[in-house]
Swiss-Prot record:
Its EC number is 3.5.4.25. The gene is ribA. Homodimer. It comes from the Bacteria. Zn(2+) binds at residues 54, 65, 67. The active site is at 126 (proton acceptor), 128 (nucleophile). Pathway: Cofactor biosynthesis; riboflavin biosynthesis; 5-amino-6-(D-ribitylamino)uracil from GTP: step 1/4. InterPro entries: GTP_cyclohydro_II, RibA, RibA-like_sf. GO terms for biological process: riboflavin biosynthetic process. It comes from Shigella boydii serotype 18 (strain CDC 3083-94 / BS512). This is GTP cyclohydrolase-2. Binds 1 zinc ion per subunit. Signal peptide: none annotated. It is an enzyme of class 3 (hydrolase). One of its GO terms (cellular component) is cytosol.
């Protein structure tokens, strides 16, 4: 286990009241959060989203990505379902960090795509570690998930880490003129399952 569960509190939101559960990485002290809605203790698969931190999309309403749109759509779907989990995976910019993400944006403004920009900065296309999320699910007592994602790699890694993904639920929202090239690149170079 790479994490420990350290704190929890009620979090009222526009979608209803969630239980916010805080986790701490044992090796680094980095924190991550789960938002739990309703009773997840039933022995049926739980609707869940692994959402990687995106300050620009989630909090600053950037149209360069689909992250903020996905966050809102996932919370809406979880609330409508009556139970579910959103794991807020604190690995900003596919885990290159906020400042490098800004540098990558500058390279994209010069014509590089999102993958090329990461490579120009010395990073892989995706530096995230989703095994941490498998540990969060396990600490929440969840083993079977209906995963809200367009990323087949996320499904593969969580499955290899012991989480039974019984269904991949598409989450295709937020396409606009500012992020079309970004989304097309994610589909073409990173294998994301995105329909235009």
């Amino acid at each position: 286990m790479q994490l420990k569960r350290v704190a929890e509190a009620k979090l009222p939101t526009p979608w209803g009241d969630f239980l916010m559960v805080g986790f701490e990485e044992l090796a680094t002290g980095h924190d991550h959060v789960a938002l739990v809605y309703g009773d997840i203790s039933e022995h049926t698969p739980v609707l869940a989203r692994v959402h990687s931190e995106c300050l620009t999309g989630d909090a600053l309403f950037s149209l360069r990505c689909d992250c903020g749109f996905q966050l809102e759509a996932a919370l809406t779907q979880i609330a409508e379902e009556g139970r579910g989990i959103l794991l807020y995976h604190r690995q900003e910019g596919r885990n290159i960090g906020l400042l490098n993400k800004i540098r990558a944006y500058a390279l994209q403004d010069q014509g590089y795509d999102t993958v090329e920009a990461n490579h120009q900065l010395g990073f892989a296309a995706d530096e995230r570690d989703f095994t941490l999320c498998a540990d969060m699910f396990k600490l929440l007592g969840v083993n079977e998930v209906r995963l809200l994602t367009n990323n087949p790699k996320k499904v593969e890694i969580l499955t290899e880490a012991g989480i039974n993904i019984v269904e991949r639920v598409p989450l295709i929202v937020g396409r606009n003129p500012n992020n079309e090239h970004y989304l097309d690149t994610k589909a073409e170079k990173m294998g994301h399952l995105l329909n235009k």
